[in-house]
UniProtKB/Swiss-Prot annotation:
Heterodimer of alpha and beta subunits. This is Neoverrucotoxin subunit alpha. Disulfide bonds: none annotated. The modification N-acetylserine is found at residue 2. Belongs to the SNTX/VTX toxin family. Has hemolytic and lethal activities. Its hemolytic activity is inhibited by anionic lipids, especially potently by cardiolipin. GO terms for cellular component: extracellular region. One of its GO terms (molecular function) is toxin activity. Expressed by the venom gland. InterPro entries: B30.2/SPRY (IPR001870), B30.2/SPRY_sf (IPR043136), Butyrophylin_SPRY (IPR003879), ConA-like_dom_sf (IPR013320), Cytolytic_pore-forming_toxin (IPR052090), PRY (IPR006574), SPRY_dom (IPR003877), Stonustoxin-like_helical (IPR048997). It is found in: Secreted.
Amino acid sequence: MSSDLVMPALGRPFTLGMLYDTRREKLIPGFSLFGDETLQQYQSSNTQRSSEFKIVASDSTESKSSAMDIEASLGVSFLGGLVEVGGSAKYLNNTKKYQNQSRVTLKYKATTIYKQFTAPPGTVKVQETVITQRGLATHVVTGILYGANAFFVFDSDKVEDTNLQDIQGKMEAVIKKIPTISIEGSASVQLTDEEKSLASNLSCKFHGDFLLESLPTTFEDAVTTYQTLPTLLGEDGASAVPMKVWLVPLKKFFSKAKLLTQEITVSKVRRIHTTLEELYKLKRRANEAMDDKLVQQIPLIHDKISNFHQIFQDYMLTVQKKIAEKLPLVRAGTESEQSLQKIIDDRAKSPFSNENVSTWLEVIEREIAVLKSCAGMVEGTQAKFVSNQTELDREVLAEDVKHALCFVFTSVERNDPYLKVLSDYLESPDSKDGKEAVPSTEDKWCFSTRVVLKMKQRAQTFCDHVNDFEKSRNVGFFVTALENGKFQGASIYHYKDGSLATQDFTFPRMPFVQGYKKRSDLLWYACDLTFDRNTINIWVSLSDNDTFAASEHGKRQNYPKHPERFLCYNQVLCNEGLTGKHYWEVEWNGYVDVGVAYISISRKEDNWVSAIGHNTCSWVFSSIPRAGYVERYNQRQYYVTVPTPGFKQLGVFLNWPDGSLSFYAVSSDEVHHLHTFKTKFTEPVYPAFCLGYRFDHGTVRLL
């Protein structure tokens, strides 16, 4: 082949008279075929000033090549790694990281001057060197068009697949406005509110032949930079760079030169394009999976995807290296195009085939989707994600954790035979081992409707437990992934006092409140309380971080005025308004009323209306020295017989949804039911206390 060639410079430092090897797409710097005098004598220049902008809406290699004016032959050389690009051409290497990500590129192109070598072949003497004698070059540069390119690459955040096209269209509409925005006006002023919102969430990456003081990273930056580009080429285009070059076969000037024997056919170029485009697409899917927020919290699956990503990256480099090795040989006529076809065919028959890798990623993506469906149910609760068994052990062994419930993804596997097959194939492509590990969606737990449904049911059960014990100080809640073949999908582990009690937890059915005998059964619901300083009466003192209260006859406390303060009775509420199921214990002595009240209870009335137990918004159990124990509501009171008079520890269990408030005498790990109020609570209730009456003193400690 002896035709002239025209190609984009792609940021490479071309000069007139420079030699070029089209077989290897290699510049040969440091030598000119013509001497300086000859170049000066036959060089001509023509002004060719122009500028244009273009929107590139696709991130495909084909679209990028078109934007850079790259023909098929040079394109396959770039894909094969033969061409090292620079300047604006680095845009070719900028690919989307994620599949579900919208990308729109704004291209600005300006040309300044065209220089050419005008001497006809055979009329000038050429300089011979070892380069020309050994046939290391095929062409010589005889024309260069100067100018500059700039590419503003705008990316959205990851979006849902269903919104991708909509976001893409809106991005194109906004970015098309950039060249029309006046330099005096702010970009935001000339956009609609919806467009402003969209533009503010776009990131920008700049690739250009212009020397900028700072690179644009936002839409606003891009608008400002775009307006300044025409001024950055300098006077008479002094800062312009080679954009397009014209090459003439070296044989026209030097008869002993080698020729480019054959070029790669367009159909073969397309197949190579397709193959590499498939690889990049699969890589983006892996990126998307690996960077998922949930995946990063689960080392079992993250490490597996990361391992695949590294293996696949190595394979891509291997394919590119093979293409780079074969292209010069095919162009020189040493090998046929079949050697390139073999690379494509070998991949199709290998574990790295598009079908195999796509199926494996499909399983991974489905697995992630199922995990997220369950994790999404737990999100927003107080459950904590832990990454592995060691971290889980550290949490369940914490001093304040009596019980721990852990929602465990049990079917996330650490080892994947397919990854071993891929790794082995990279080491030994001719090996036939591993055929049985071809990926498949059959018999995968994440594709089983039964398994997924059961996982969601368990996740809902777990969430119910979290909500039931939301304020419990004794129960910790965790989520993790631990491989366990006994359970498909997920299970709930129960740890008690730091030890695993069961891997398939079912909360014991609640007995009637009178049926509780063991204190440990109620401690599931134990909550932390503190006295509210804004409600406490001035004749009651507080200490021990607001957990101990005592009546102080004749000792007025210096509390500031507050509208919530009880003025007439030695009463105090706790800070915590409670709904749900809660249990707390107090250590009491003397005259003490213990119960709950609505926040609306009167604070100022100098009569029984503001006394707890003497109205319709409070319920109490009382210890009255020399008289015994009573339960009191709305001024009605009844004496209660207790098994051990003088007991010092009282337990209170609130089942707000069920409308019950129960009191227990506590001794070691046993409780004895004393009384239960039944009602319908209509608002949160606050633990309430009255300490001392007349000459009787009273103290309460929150345990």
